[in-house]
Amino acid sequence: MARRSLFSLMAVLAAAAAIDSVPVSLEAQQAPAAAPPADAAQVAYGRSLAVLGDCEGCHNRPGGQPLAGGLPLNTPFGVIYSANITPDHDTGIGTWTADDFWNALHRGVRANGAKLYPAFPYPYFTHATRAESDALYAYFRTVAPVSYRPPANRLPFPFNIRFLVTFWNMLNFKEDTAPTTGPTPGEHIVRGLGHCGACHTPKTALGGDKKGRELEGGKLDNWFAPALTGDVRAGLGAWPAADIAEYLKTGRNARANASGPMGDVVSHSSSKMADAEVQAIAAYLKTQTARLETPAAPAPDPKVMAVGQAIYVDECAACHAVDGKAAPTYFPPLPGAAVTQSRDPTTVLRFILSGTQTVATDARPTPLSMPSFAWKLDDAQVAAVATYVRNSWGNQAPAVSAGEVAKLRRKVAAKPVQKPSAVI
């Protein structure tokens, strides 16, 4: 949301803060009773839930100790550093009770009563059951405590005022007062701990999920997460459930390779899930119909297509083949690819400008790389080749302009590589 719009709401927000000041403490007082002492089975269950929630993906920083936090999370409103969730008493959650943990997971409230920023995806985690919360808590109590205090968040005024989250919650958060593990295991994972919509659902100006647009694809920090609906061109409509499960488990299938932020998800989370879990996710995603099928795009300029084809033959065909079919499971095919035909070309442009590397998993231990072409191709050339691959071999997608490329090039060059987060 533009800052002037947010400032115009300051009076309302201040009132919301005043109203919120008492209920915060009441939430902590009225929380359910503390969980009983953990046993080995509960800890093991919690460890598996931490995998489902991709906790390492945000709470591990490069070169840091496991779950000690400090990873910078890019949001549209500034940078937030992930928390230390080890049981260290001074810098982690070592003094938290099971009730404190439940309040954080379920309501977005810290042990001291302050609101959590929804970069921590409590709007999804609220669907976790109390038994799941207690198991996660039991597991985190067993990890090695690390004395490490993450850097202070870098949020400009007024986004650095935590009580503004109260207003955000009014618009975007509904606590699940009776969470269950149903109706299907896949739905519980996707809508709950898996928090797939945090990236794959389009966002409002304030960073909340757009209502009625679940899993239709979302833009975040110079990436576009494609739709997970039944959209045939820009979603998973052409993917059998087995292909979805294979992609989540191994990072590759005959249609796509995981890299970028999704590569992190596969590395830390889905590749470590049980086969039954990835199969359940796949089965649920196949029930998501395309509420808004991607419309056909106008035919691109033939001159631009000719320029793009020449660049493609010179620079891309060696790996992706002249017909775009490449070598499936090694170099992803381009015909019919959702990421290629998405309404937003950001990820395709990001691959061309920055290059990418596929994730390494136990099933596919050798990562494969695509080089950066930012040094070699100017904005018009990148736009031309992107337009070409988005509109060849049966693909249809809007043409890309040199201006779009220039804008993304500046953003990518200006920011260090950090973990993206769709909301604050």
Question: Where would I find each of the regions flagged by the language model?
Answer:
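Flexible coil segments in periplasmic/lumen-exposed cytochrome c-class electron-transfer proteins
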Residues: 30-35, 39-41, 52, 60-80, ...
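Acidic/histidine-rich, surface-exposed loop or edge segments in extracytoplasmic proteins
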Residues: 79-87, 223-229
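Aromatic- and charge-enriched surface segment that lines or borders ligand/interaction sites
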Residues: 93-109, 113, 135, 237-241
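Extended, polar beta-sheet/loop recognition surfaces of beta-rich domains
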Residues: 241, 248, 335-384
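C-terminal structural cap/anchor segments
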Residues: 309-350, 366
